[in-house]
């Protein structure tokens, strides 16, 4: 969006706080319905980030696929779970939780220290002027497809494998 700098910065901070609070809600809330709604807040904030960066197609896809389908499916599955069985042996803090929080905190701290020191100017997508002219003739949807199948093929495959493992884990948890 073409917004003045102060409004754009305010929206970035507001959406960032929404992401942080929603992420904490997903992790810390004990009721799975509330966690699913917090996940919906996180996904909506991500789509609003895409709108702020003028990626309207990706924002619409984010809303339709993740909020409209995946999050509704999660809420639907959680509603069919037996809630009284879920809370019987619920311990707030275990050894695995401590190890997981230690690993996540160390990854977070390392990212916070590495990202500001990285030279982002060395990352150049197009080096020739004819590539820039050719990219202007291709629509946004085609550019997304080209980048997903060439530049971002490996990360795209990793994300699809992670989503597949998460889906298999959700099915395994639902069957127990």
Curated annotation (Swiss-Prot):
Disulfide-bond pairs as recorded: none
InterPro entries to which the protein is assigned, alphabetical: NAD(P)H-Q_Oxidoreduct_6 (IPR050290), NADH_UbQ/plastoQ_OxRdtase_su6 (IPR001457), Nuo/plastoQ_OxRdtase_6_NuoJ (IPR042106)
Molecular function via GO: NADH dehydrogenase (ubiquinone) activity; quinone binding
Compartments, as annotated in UniProt: Plastid, Chloroplast thylakoid membrane
UniProt-listed Enzyme Commission number(s): 7.1.1.-
Residue spans crossing the bilayer: 10-30, 32-52, 61-81, 95-115, 152-172
UniProt catalytic activity: a plastoquinone + NADH + (n+1) H(+)(in) = a plastoquinol + NAD(+) + n H(+)(out); a plastoquinone + NADPH + (n+1) H(+)(in) = a plastoquinol + NADP(+) + n H(+)(out)
One Pfam family, short name: Oxidored_q3
GO cellular component, one term: chloroplast thylakoid membrane
Primary localization class, coarse: plastid
Top EC class for this record: translocase
Membrane topology of the entry: Multi-pass membrane protein
Entry keywords, A to Z: Chloroplast, Membrane, NAD, NADP, Plastid, Plastoquinone, Quinone, Thylakoid, Translocase, Transmembrane, Transmembrane helix, Transport
Gene3D superfamilies: NADH-ubiquinone/plastoquinone oxidoreductase chain 6, subunit NuoJ
Domain of life: Eukaryota
Family to which the UniProt record says this protein belongs: Belongs to the complex I subunit 6 family.
Subunit structure, as described in the record: NDH is composed of at least 16 different subunits, 5 of which are encoded in the nucleus.
PANTHER family reported for this sequence: NAD(P)H-QUINONE OXIDOREDUCTASE SUBUNIT 6, CHLOROPLASTIC
Function recorded in the entry: NDH shuttles electrons from NAD(P)H:plastoquinone, via FMN and iron-sulfur (Fe-S) centers, to quinones in the photosynthetic chain and possibly in a chloroplast respiratory chain. The immediate electron acceptor for the enzyme in this species is believed to be plastoquinone. Couples the redox reaction to proton translocation, and thus conserves the redox energy in a proton gradient.
Name of the molecule in the record: NAD(P)H-quinone oxidoreductase subunit 6, chloroplastic
Organism this protein belongs to: Manihot esculenta (Cassava)
């Amino acid at each position: 969006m073409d917004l003045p700098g102060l409004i754009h910065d305010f929206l970035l901070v507001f959406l960032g706080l929404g992401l942080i609070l929603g992420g904490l809600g997903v992790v810390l809330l004990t009721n799975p319905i509330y966690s699913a709604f917090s996940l919906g807040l996180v996904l909506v904030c991500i789509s609003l980030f895409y709108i702020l960066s003028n990626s309207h197609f990706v924002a619409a896809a984010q809303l339709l696929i993740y909020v409209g389908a995946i999050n509704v499916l999660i809420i639907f599955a959680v509603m069919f779970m037996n809630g009284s069985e879920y809370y019987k042996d619920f311990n707030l803090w275990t050894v695995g939780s401590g190890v997981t929080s230690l690993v996540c905190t160390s990854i977070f701290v390392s990212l916070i220290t590495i990202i500001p020191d990285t030279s982002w100017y060395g990352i150049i997508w197009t080096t020739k002027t004819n590539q820039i002219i050719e990219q202007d003739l291709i629509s946004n949807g085609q550019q997304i497809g080209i980048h997903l199948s060439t530049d971002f093929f490996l990360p795209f495959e990793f994300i699809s494998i992670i989503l597949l493992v998460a889906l298999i884990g959700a099915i395994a948890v639902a069957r127990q």
